[in-house]
Amino acid sequence: SGRPPGPGETWRSPDLARTLEKIAATGAEDFYRGELAQRIDDFSRKYRGYIRGEDLEQYSPEWVEPVKVNYRGYDVWELPPNGHGIVALMALNILKGFDSCDGDAALFCHRQIEAVKLAFADCFEYLSDPRYMDVSVEALLSEEYAAQRRKLIGRRALLPAAGTPSRGGTVYLAAADGEGSMVSFIQSNFRGFGSGLVVPSTGISLHNRGCSFTLDGAHVNCIAPGKKPYHTIIPGFLTREGKPIGPFGVMGAFMQ
């Protein structure tokens, strides 16, 4: 229609509905190796994009081990890099070494803010596709490294360079049952509607996560074929003494 839907208005995408039916009927095979894959390839070439049918064909989902830290008796779990869930864990590692703030709300907030800023500084320097990282997750989450970073936090705010606020387009879902099973699920096209490009007759909106790469050839997160970019989505879990407390997550790019 050329306009966004209004409040309460039902939005329909028959093209996307047909695409989802095709994906369901083929077990996603068509998306990665069939007609849909070819349409994505053709569309990408037309607009000088970098997605090719070979990229889709070579993709397969990965089963990864989550990473965690213990924060005051609770195990906090996140996905490993290339996502930045490790930022939350690094900040918690820094914070848990502080004594009580004795009711000083300003000091309490100050320490949290500074810990997150320090964690992000490391994140932007070292995080990437784990196959390319030259600093290990274990090193970043070590107690010794957290102690080094903690020493940098005093009564005054650190002064990082000003950045550009980011806007996100993310959906998060959490579910749990009475038997301890938990699901922490997040999906994002990144900024706004992603790239703003929809593959004709499919309803598929292409994301723009590639903009999280850097063009600095010497940086660990430099763009490369088959490489995963630094990622902002961080679905998590909370457990205590091996027992589930609950899933958690939030929308909002770097504010997560």
Label every model-predicted segment.
Residues 63, 167-170, 231-233:
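Short, small/polar residue-rich loop motifs at catalytic or cofactor-binding pockets
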Residues 99-189, 201-202, 209:
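Internal maturation/activation junctions in enzymes
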Residues 15-22, 93-94, 176-185:
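Active-site-proximal alpha-helical segments within enzyme catalytic domains
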Residues 1-27, 31-33, 37-83, 141, ...:
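Noncatalytic scaffold domains of N-terminal-nucleophile
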Residues 77-85, 170-174, 186-197, 250-256:
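Glycine-rich phosphate/pyrophosphate-binding beta-alpha loops
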Residues 50-52, 181-246, 253-254:
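Active-site rim segments in enzyme catalytic domains, especially the processed small/beta chain
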Residues 85-99, 238-246, 253-256:
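M16/insulysin-pitrilysin zinc metalloprotease superfamily fold
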